[in-house]
């Protein structure tokens, strides 16, 4: 993780402000700190909400401070995802192959390059990895946590709804003979709907 962190930091230019999509996330996070929670028609607000927590501690008129904060958070989340990927690997492989899996994830060039842009991908990936980690447990109760994280993925990116679909398919294929199969899945679905309902209600109010 530390070596991968070094690569990520090496690829980032902290001397220039964010622009393009990461600019939108930064401006939205600043708006959230000022009480504006309006949504984009094509972009989730989970990442900007997460960033706004940290922006609340910044009192600066220099936009570069906000730019570098969102970059640092993105890098931090991406780095934290590496040991999570190892834990997912351990559900299927021994320690050696799990380490290989996490290393491939840690040093994938595209992921390292994008992690320093301040985009939503690292947090989205972490939510997906966490969701798969819990669904790979043999106890059906963990589907509740898995679907909760699927709801978080939807907050981060609208296409995160596909995480819910994939988790559902995996759940019924791998745990179909388990006791309390439908009860725990039903609880997970209720929690998933509770998590995403604020997004759905707000989007319906804003965009119809």
Question: Which residues does each predicted region cover?
Answer:
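Membrane-lumen/periplasm interface segments of specific transmembrane helices
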Residues: 7-8, 183-208
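Membrane-interface transmembrane helices that cradle and orient dolichyl/undecaprenyl
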Residues: 90-93, 131-145, 153, 173-177
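Transmembrane-embedded, aromatic-rich helix segments that form part
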Residues: 144-146, 159-174
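Transmembrane helix irregularities
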Residues: 14, 76, 92-93, 107, ...
């Amino acid at each position: 993780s530390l070596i991968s962190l070094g690569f990520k930091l090496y690829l980032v230019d902290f001397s220039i402000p964010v622009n393009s999509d990461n600019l939108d996330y930064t401006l939205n996070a600043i708006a959230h700190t000022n009480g504006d929670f309006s949504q984009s028609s094509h972009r989730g607000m989970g990442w900007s909400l997460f960033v706004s927590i940290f922006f609340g501690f910044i009192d600066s008129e220099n936009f570069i401070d906000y730019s570098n904060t969102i970059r640092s958070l993105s890098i931090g989340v991406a780095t934290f995802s590496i040991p999570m990927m190892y834990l997912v690997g351990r559900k299927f492989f021994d320690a050696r192959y799990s380490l290989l899996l996490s290393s491939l994830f840690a040093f994938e060039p595209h992921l390292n390059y994008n992690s320093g842009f301040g985009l939503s991908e690292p947090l989205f990936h972490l939510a997906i990895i966490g969701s798969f980690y819990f669904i790979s447990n043999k106890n059906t109760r963990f589907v509740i946590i898995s679907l909760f994280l699927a709801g978080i993925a939807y907050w981060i990116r609208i296409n995160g709804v596909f995480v819910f679909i994939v988790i559902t398919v995996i759940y019924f294929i791998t745990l179909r003979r388990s006791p309390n199969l439908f009860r725990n899945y039903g609880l997970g679905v209720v929690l998933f709907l509770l998590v995403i309902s604020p997004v759905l209600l707000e989007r319906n109010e804003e965009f119809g």
